[in-house]
Curated annotation (Swiss-Prot):
It catalyses: a lipid X + a UDP-2-N,3-O-bis[(3R)-3-hydroxyacyl]-alpha-D-glucosamine = a lipid A disaccharide + UDP + H(+). Pathway: Bacterial outer membrane biogenesis; LPS lipid A biosynthesis. PANTHER family: LIPID-A-DISACCHARIDE SYNTHASE, LIPID-A-DISACCHARIDE SYNTHASE, MITOCHONDRIAL-RELATED. The lineage of its organism: Bacteria, Pseudomonadati, Pseudomonadota, Gammaproteobacteria, Legionellales. It is an enzyme of class 2 (transferase). Keywords: Glycosyltransferase, Lipid A biosynthesis, Lipid biosynthesis, Lipid metabolism, Transferase. Its EC number is 2.4.1.182. GO terms for molecular function: lipid-A-disaccharide synthase activity; phospholipid binding. Belongs to the LpxB family. Pfam families: LpxB. Condensation of UDP-2,3-diacylglucosamine and 2,3-diacylglucosamine-1-phosphate to form lipid A disaccharide, a precursor of lipid A, a phosphorylated glycolipid that anchors the lipopolysaccharide to the outer membrane of the cell. This is Lipid-A-disaccharide synthase. GO terms for biological process: lipid A biosynthetic process.
């Protein structure tokens, strides 16, 4: 019987989901393994003893982080005490690099092994973080093959586990059945809206999406809109911004993407999820002007959408800051729906993404890495 324990640390909804899948795979591999950590509802449901609720920690942008500093500091102090009083056999840090790299240092100080799952995007900015990774991380579990090559070059132990989204199960229901379930007409165009999972994203992006929707309706009166609400968000948070024509459902992205003809999405992991299902999309984003200005100084990339970053060529138009207007969004969605040649060229490009990211079940692959680290 194993008396080993693993701490899973996730600070955002996407990390909470990865942590939940990893927890399930670990329990299958080693049923008596004790799992605790920082996360949200998904990790709790997967049997993780969550002693730090991460819901308030999912922020983006420098100014936004300052506003949540008290909650972030409290979480850090709680983990630091846990490392000293109840040291686990391994800590798995999932994404969330600003917080997690700092806590990786504290874990190593306490003599605990460290696995980092989902690499910080050091290939995009702050490459200097490689020094911390070399010093405080025992093993990297990465989602992209080019990241594996990067860490091999830097002599950091690494496993390319594949991207979880590339191996996600597809809905068993037919398109007509899903449309019936959502009370939508399968013969009319459907546009999916993804305004993000953070409150600040919702406040900035959803009003624009709603206005864009009204403009699209003037051109395509039969268009239908559907919004899958992120698990960490209550309907009350978005209700003030909604218009009657938008159908809101609770966290059912896979079914939504199975019926959508196009999507409007906040920049983030969801852009890759949409792209992998070959749904043409437009990416929008707005942050505080100072945050954006600093980002442009620090980040040496032409794109911010994950689907564009991992593709050999751009697969989605990005509308950022002042370029993100209801009219610009509506114009691009109209092209994605009505310009046949343009639409087909985008779908063709999207089809090349999955093969380069699929390595089987990513959670099971990471679970094997965890098992090797704690039992070796």
């Amino acid at each position: 019987m194993s008396n080993k324990s693993v701490l899973l640390i996730a600070g955002e909804p996407s990390g909470d989901l990865l942590g939940a899948h990893l927890a399930q795979s670990l329990k299958s591999l080693e049923p008596n393994l004790k799992l605790a950590g920082m996360g949200g509802k998904r990790m709790r449901e997967a049997g993780v003893e969550v002693f730090i609720n991460a819901d308030k920690l999912a922020v983006v942008g420098l100014l936004e982080i300052l506003r949540q500093f008290r909650d972030i500091r409290h979480a850090m102090q709680t983990l630091k005490r846990y490392f000293k009083k109840t040291p686990p056999d391994l800590v798995v840090f999932i994404d969330y690099p600003g917080f997690n790299l700092h806590m990786a240092k504290q874990a190593k100080k306490a003599g605990i092994k460290v696995l980092y799952y989902v690499s910080p995007q050091i290939w995009a900015w702050r490459y200097g973080r490689i020094k911390k990774i070399k010093k405080y991380v025992d093993h990297m579990a990465v989602l992209f093959d080019f990241e594996e090559k990067l860490y091999q070059k830097e002599n950091v132990p690494v496993s390319f586990v594949g991207h979880p989204l590339a191996n996600a199960p597809t809905p068993s229901l037919s398109r007509n059945e899903i449309c019936k379930q959502f009370n939508l007409d399968p013969d009319k165009p459907i546009v999916a809206l993804f305004p993000g999972s953070r409150e600040q994203e919702i406040n900035k992006l959803l009003p624009m999406m709603v206005q864009a929707g009204k403009l699209i309706q003037t051109q395509i009166p039969t268009v239908q809109f559907i919004l899958p609400l992120a698990l960490n968000l209550a309907l009350d948070k978005i209700r003030p911004f909604l218009s009657p024509e938008i159908k809101v459902i609770q966290n059912d992205i896979s079914h939504v993407l199975a019926i959508a003809h196009a999507a409007v999405a906040a920049s983030g992991t969801v852009t890759l999820e949409i792209a992998l299902q070959q749904v043409p999309l437009v990416i929008i984003y707005k942050v505080a002007p100072l945050t954006f200005w600093l980002g442009k100084k620090l980040i040496r990339l032409s794109f911010i959408g994950l689907c564009n970053l991992v593709s050999p060529e751009p697969v989605a138009v990005e509308l950022l800051q002042q370029d993100a207007t209801p009219q610009a969004i509506a114009d691009e969605v109209f092209q994605l729906l009505n310009n046949h040649n343009y639409r087909q060229s985008i779908i063709g490009k999207l089809g090349h993404l999955r093969p380069q990211l699929d390595r089987g079940n990513a959670a099971q692959n990471v679970a094997k890495v965890v098992h090797n680290l704690i039992f070796s």
